[in-house]
Amino acid sequence: MDPRSEVLLRQPELFQGSLLLVGLPADDLLGKLPNARGWCWHAGDQAALDARFEGRVDFGVEAPEATFEAAVLFLPKARDLTDYLLNALASRLAGRELFLVGEKRGGIEAAAKQLSPFGRARKLDSARHCQLWQVTVENAPQAVTLESLARPYQIELQDGPLTVISLPGVFSHGRLDRGSALLLENIDKLPSGNLLDFGCGAGVLGAAVKRRYPHNDVVMLDVDAFATASSRLTLAANGLEAQVVTGDGIDAAPMGLNTILSNPPFHVGVHTDYMATENLLKKARQHLKSGGELRLVANNFLRYQPLIEEHVGYCHVKAQGNGFKIYSAKRS
């Protein structure tokens, strides 16, 4: 069981009423708290929880409509996402209890200060390298809309400026990261047809490619509902259309692709996790047509080239700079 869940279960009497678990891990916590429901935005966690606790977890970027007497927020990595979630919860919990649990290395001590606008926060427990904080909501805020927290920015491309709409919690929120910038300089001569933007984030790559190659059918895929919500806003801001899918890794992608384009993630929360990218590299061949291309950008220190050659085909470095490399391989 996740150590954050174990910390909650050290004081189970606090969590016996109608409870909303927000950003909960895919463990057995719901089985221990029969009156609790979950709210999740990670497609992989959602699938795992649905398989065990069908009908007890809501998925998406907005708080569920069902009433709850208390809520526990599992601290996310991004401070701005924490602010959005705390606001969404506190606005519904006037006079009631709001809890925050997280790992010490994830910044729980500092994040606890984000409870102070709602009332006097206090630390209830510290164990398993985690902390549990609580506040009685004395100052319930007005709920803010997610879109009001978006950070739009523009990037200059060969065919003109592209507007990107970035939501809280999305990778490289409010700015273009160096890896994507390098890949955007190298989206020439992509195969025509069906293209997948894997790990689409705010939709920078997918939108840029759709505008440059308008006859291509573009699918944008991410495991995170905040990312796919951002991608839809980015497409709309530029008058573009593409299919946006929230799904768990390459298994959620269509078959018969001509191109897979990616700036793949290797972090989940505060943890390093290469599984999604390694799974992409191992299974890309199944999703690509013969002659289809995998083109991705990665940090120099990530040794993806041997894995690509083993599972896709001959791989070469198309470009490099600022600590990143672009790998290109065509399915033989």
Swiss-Prot record:
Gene Ontology CC: cytoplasm
EC number: 2.1.1.172
Keyword Transmembrane in record: no
Coiled-coil features, chain-numbered ranges: none
Molecular functions per Gene Ontology: 16S rRNA (guanine(1207)-N(2))-methyltransferase activity
Keywords on record: Cytoplasm, Methyltransferase, rRNA processing, S-adenosyl-L-methionine, Transferase
Catalytically driven reaction(s): guanosine(1207) in 16S rRNA + S-adenosyl-L-methionine = N(2)-methylguanosine(1207) in 16S rRNA + S-adenosyl-L-homocysteine + H(+)
Highest taxon listed in the record's lineage: Bacteria
Subcellular location per the Swiss-Prot or TrEMBL entry: Cytoplasm
Broad class of enzyme this protein falls into: transferase
Assembly behavior: Monomer.
Free-text function comment from the UniProt entry: Specifically methylates the guanine in position 1207 of 16S rRNA in the 30S particle.
Family: Belongs to the methyltransferase superfamily. RsmC family.
PANTHER family registered for this protein in UniProt: RIBOSOMAL RNA SMALL SUBUNIT METHYLTRANSFERASE C
Name under which the protein is recorded: Ribosomal RNA small subunit methyltransferase C
Phylogenetic placement of the source organism: Bacteria, Pseudomonadati, Pseudomonadota, Gammaproteobacteria, Pseudomonadales
